[in-house]
Each structure stands twice: as C-alpha cells, then as structure tokens.
C-alpha cells in the first residue's frame, strides 16, 4: 500500500470532474487537485464551485479554446515554476471535447509526463441497471 503522503511526480494531470453531482468525483482527483501548483480550467466560475466545495486552494487559470495557444505558451515558458499542472473541464474528462490537445502535444515534445486521472463513469453506471 502506498503512503498517504506520497509525492506526485512532476507532470500534467488530466483530471476528470463530476458531470452533475459534485460528490461524483474520486478521492484521487481531489488529492491531485489539492496538490496542484496550477489548475487550468475552461470557466473559472464553474470550476470554483467544485474547488470551493472541496476546499482546494490551488491557483486557477482560465484555459479555453480562445486562449489555449497563449496559455500553453505561457505555461511552458515558466514550466520551472510548476511541478503539478492539472487540466480540468467544466464537466467530465478534459480533452474529449474540450481544449487540451495543444498542451498535451507540448508535453509530449518536452518529454513531460502526462497522467490521466479517471473519473466516475456514467457508461458503467448505466450498464449496471
């Protein structure tokens, strides 16, 4: 069993968030978000609801289709400042239909680890009934 105080490796964490009910999030996702140096999100107003609910005080930066290139460039120009970068969407798993592909491509080019943090699956919930 791993220690509760286990350090996270430096990298980009793709963190799934609840689709509707704020309680539909994994303990691991909450832990990653609390340990993040910076959280990139689509809409800070929506994300603040989730982060406030779980007392997550990490720096929050708006990251959407209109500023994706600019923010990705800024993040990588200051990458030495960040160990844990998390990417979240307003609901569900980032990058599926949300921004993030540019950031992921940059991480791959710079050999920066990318870690997916899965969420609660509505597909398996539906299949169970």
What do the predicted segments below correspond to?
Residues 24-25, 50-51, 72, 96-99, ...:
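Short glycine-/acidic-enriched loop or helix-start segments at secondary-structure transitions
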